[in-house]
Amino acid sequence: MNSDNKNIPALFPPTFSSVSEDPKGEPIVVLMSGGVDSSLTAQLLMDTGWNPVGVTMRIPVVDGCGVSRRSCGTEAAFVCRDLGIPHYFVDTENTFRESVIEPFRQAYLNGQTPSPCVDCNTHLKFDLVWTAVEQQLGIQLLYRQPKGVE
């Protein structure tokens, strides 16, 4: 993995920003999974004058899950390296267990339908991760898919 990857300590509280029409080379965070969507987003932002910075949540790996593919963090780091953009990890392992895995487990045991993506978005992506980005990197812009675009 690229030696430029750094861990960003997770800090609170959150704020949110939106994208302006004229980038002028401004840095903008792309939450990177290493998949096609986030990778293409980073490339398209570069192509339109933005200066994307990849950020990936470090989440716990489930013991014995038998996953043979590399973690998404590794994939994201390789994509960022290939694009020539910085990449950072935010350590979210403990909060992920407490705010996503445990509520999922409890809901499932109680016969309810868990909603782990909502919990992750609320407690990690747009709270813990974004705050770490703002405080540690000083970046004020986060790219998100415009409403109504699929």
Where do the model's predicted regions map?
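ATP-dependent adenylation/nucleotidyltransferase module used to activate substrates
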Residues: 2-150
